[in-house]
Amino acid sequence: MAAVVLSGINMEKIRSPRNHTTELNDGERALYAPKLCTAFQPLSQEEIINRTYNGNLFDVIKFFPPESVDLMIIDPPYNLSKNFGGNKFTARSNDAYREYLESWFPLIVRVLKKNASLYICGDWKCTAALYTVVNNFLTVRNRITWQREKGRGAVSNWKNSCEDIWFATVGPDYYFDADAVKQKRRVIAPYRENGEPKDWKETDDGKFRLTCASNFWDDITVPYWSMSENTDHPAQKPEKLIAKLILASSKPGALVFDPFLGSGTTSVTAKKLGRKYCGIEMNTEYCLLAEKRLARADCDKSIQGYSGGVFWERNTGREQGK
């Protein structure tokens, strides 16, 4: 059970036996606490590999070696008022939010290699500020829009169910593998040529076609209570989403860095896919959750919606043999 503080009183969060949300007990906190890192002096390349740094981004990133990261994935606080485990972020004007981004973005650009790529997440409200800041330092290559599947209804506005991810690179020579992120889709109206399937395959489970990934993703499931990757982090990204970014923009063994690590999804997914990882997170509880998930990834490298070297549509577990 997870301890919850409500009006100064410790209470236990009661979960259903079917709830697979990852949480911590006191024994696990003691077990994983020694794995968390801090930085007080310049770090070597080896000292940032496969590490979780528990601290404020401004205090830690200045000690990272320059040009040390192959791929950076950033999921910063959006321009919304939200409580991240006791660390509150307050919504502000568009100009003030842009200034917030500009206060730390130059610091993280310093650690990117000359051939590195970067992805940064946002919603409709902050995406313009993200583009402006990123474009001042890097070359913006594309914008990915992904459908959250979840989303609260609205009476006086459109339901907000999509988010953006800006893709940028340091220079013109960057790594990108389109074949690594192909999607296996059902064929609704199969076309045949001379009686044979054209551009699709017929299997015992149905008719499927491998398609190249576009910049609109409608196959992502946001983590929820029945998924073991789920945590109590209020803005957790799906492992499947991060897996697409990692597979497309890094080689095996590359270093993937997340300066707003949260409960560890980027590091965990990088480890599952054979990459090195590093993250910075100021909330200790989230860092400990990340370490628990990383330990579990030693024996469980599965990623929901990704199997057989391809990404699958939602609700295809039977076809995947799961």
Language model region names:
Residues M1-L289:
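Core catalytic lobe of class I
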Residues L288-K322:
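PRPP-dependent phosphoribosyltransferase catalytic core
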